[in-house]
Amino acid sequence: MLGRDGVMPLDHFRRLIDVHLIGTFNMIRLFADKARHLDPLSEDGDRGVIVNTSSIFGLEGQIDAVSYSAAKAGIAGMTLPLARELAREGIRVVAIAPGIFETPMVTSLRETAREQILDAVAFPKRMGKPREYAQLVRHICENNMLNGAVIRIDAGIRT
């Protein structure tokens, strides 16, 4: 928030909140409006599941990332209330809070920065792979008992 070049512009904070939090909410509301009119997919009466991406930064915060952390915390924070509200429509809501994954953003960091991040990882001592994230999404979609939860997938990292 306070850097070498001065205070963070408020527009920077607003932009990250708008993209990550408000953008997520917008997609949820549009999907929910369409999904509630679908025929149930099973005897449970489910009409779909919304899987959002939060972040461990949203659960624990991260230095130099207050706006990103706040946006991702908002996604985690609205998961249970949305699950409760959309339950009557047969729509589940779950959020995933990933740790450090092999993404272009992370792999573009300097090697020393990546090593520093990996020092905080418990086990396995590596970045997550996109397929591991996808496996969790699939499990969420297949298991109707998962609803209203924020699931960490972070190899025990604590920042």
Where are the model-predicted features located?
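Catalytic Tyr-X3-Lys loop
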Residues: G6-N26, V51, I75
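Catalytic Tyr-x(3-8)-Lys segment
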Residues: I17-D18, T112-E132
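Residue(s) in the substrate-gating loop at a strand-loop-helix junction
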Residues: S55
